[in-house]
Regions:
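N-terminal targeting leaders characterized by basic, low-complexity, disordered sequences
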Residues: 1-32
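Structural motif
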Residues: 110-112, 148-152, 187-193, 234-246, ...
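Repeated scaffold domains used in trafficking and secretory/extracellular systems
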Residues: 88-98, 127-138, 166-177, 209-219, ...
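Aromatic (tryptophan-biased) beta-strands that constitute blades/sheets of beta-rich domains
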Residues: 75-94, 115, 119-128, 158-164, ...
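Short loop/turn segments that connect beta-strands within beta-propeller blades
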Residues: 115-117, 154-157, 194-199, 247-250, ...
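Hydrophobic membrane-insertion alpha-helices, especially the h-region
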Residues: 53-70
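Solenoidal tandem-repeat scaffolds enriched in leucines and small polar residues
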Residues: 189-282
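Structured, soluble extracytoplasmic/luminal domains of envelope-associated proteins
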Residues: 121-175, 299-302, 309-335
């Protein structure tokens, strides 16, 4: 009997030990699974961090850039530092303009390209009496106003020359280097169209009665479409006619290659210009915008009641200035987009003699004062200078060319 109880106890002990062993093995197996799961979670987190880290770095960098841009846009300056100066310049007979990130310097006998350190990149000679330049992108034309000579050039130098049969009234150039000139032939005027090398593409004789006297000419970026503003008198009323010529395939079957034209009774259009893909006719009562690469159409007309005393523009903006009767608010400036939408209107009191768009900024000056506004109309700089200001325009980030009667300076606002 005793042996029987012993055997039963042994069996029970063995079952208990086996149960504990199975429980332990099960627990160990569960612990191993949890460990594997933990390893998977950690690996996923590491992968997520690897993805998020560069994204976070990029977002921080973008934020810093935007913050810096906003700071610089809102920052105003009250002084400037002269970085480079040249007192050997003949600023009386020499003129300056911006070309391809550098300075185009020209006079009656020479044209040269100068960098921002006032070092000459190249220089070439010609012979003119009254040189006037027009620049578009990397191309320029210099014409002898009331003379018969023109030179075509790009950032590398002169690409062609022309000797015209009649006196040059005005010359314009496109981004592709195509150029147009209005020539005065006495009873008739001519509008000639040239390649970058100076070769004649087309010539068009006009009559003062039909379509009128050409006031201005402008060229599209594609180098194919030419815009001309004519003026004539109809029944004692001054009338303007805007014509678009197409020298490509689209215009070959049209009379005189005119693909579209618009007449404005009682309106004077002294100035026209291409603004990127759009064109604008600056009128004495506002402006009209045209759109269309091959056959331009009227897009929008903005009319104003006040007398316009100044206009300025670039590819994205059109600016008008009006004179007010108030001593506290002498002038009103309105700036529109190239689609004709008003961006801002503001009063100002600076007695300027020149106002222009320069590298996305509005600059104005008189003989002793300079002023710079950003494209939102906020004043960036206003100050007086010693000496007589001859010219002033933007060269790049916070740098300007200041032409004085005593010499030429590259300045930085501070």
């Amino acid at each position: 009997m005793a042996n029987t109880f012993k055997n039963i106890k042994k069996k029970l002990r063995r079952k208990r030990l086996l149960a504990e062993k199975r429980h332990l093995e099960k627990a160990q197996a569960g612990a191993g699974g949890n460990e594997a799961a933990r390893r998977k979670i950690k690996a996923a987190l590491r992968r997520k961090k690897a993805v998020l880290k560069p994204v976070a770095v990029i977002l921080i960098a973008v934020f810093v850039v935007l913050a810096g841009f906003l700071f610089l846009e809102k920052r105003t300056y009250r002084n400037y530092k002269v970085q480079v100066t040249s007192e050997q310049e003949d600023t009386v007979s020499t003129q300056y303009t911006y070309l391809s990130g550098k300075i185009l310097r020209y006079s009656s006998d020479e044209v040269s390209l100068v960098n921002n350190k006032l070092e000459t990149v190249w220089s070439q000679t010609y012979d003119m009496q009254n040189p006037v330049a027009d620049v578009c992108g990397d191309c320029a034309v210099i014409a002898d106003k009331d003379g018969t000579s023109m030179v075509f050039l790009d950032k590398n130098g002169i690409t062609g020359t022309v000797s015209t049969s009649y006196s040059i009234v005005k010359a314009k150039v496109s981004k592709t280097g195509m150029a147009a000139a209005i020539l005065d032939g006495g009873d008739h005027t001519w509008i000639n169209f040239y390649n970058l090398d100076g070769s004649l593409v087309a010539e068009n004789q006009t009559n003062i009665q039909d379509p009128g006297y050409p006031m201005d000419v402008a060229l599209a970026d594609n180098g194919v479409v030419m815009m001309v503003a004519y003026q004539f008198v109809d029944s004692s009323e001054t009338t303007s006619y805007i014509a678009f010529y197409n020298f490509g395939e689209v215009g070959q079957n049209e009379d005189d290659r005119i693909v579209s034209g618009y007449t404005y009774d009682g309106v004077v259009v002294p100035q026209i210009q291409y603004l990127g893909s759009n064109a604008v006719a600056l009128r004495d009562d506002g402006f009209t915008i045209y759109s269309g690469r091959q056959i331009p159409k009227e897009l929008k007309t903005v009319q104003v009641e006040q007398e316009i005393i100044s206009t300025f523009y670039d590819e994205n903006n059109i600016g008008l200035v009006f004179k007010n009767d108030s001593k506290d608010k002498q002038y009103t400036m309105q700036v529109y987009s190239s689609a004709g939408k008003l961006k801002f209107s503001k009063y100002f009191n600076i007695p300027y003699t020149t106002i222009r768009m320069s590298d996305d900024y509005i600059v104005m000056y008189n003989s002793s004062q300079l002023c710079v506004l950003n494209i939102n109309g906020s004043e960036k700089y206003f100050g007086s200078v010693d000496g007589t200001v001859k010219d002033f325009f933007k060269l790049g980030w916070n740098k300007y060319l200041l032409v004085m009667d005593t010499g030429v300076n590259v300045i930085k606002l501070s």
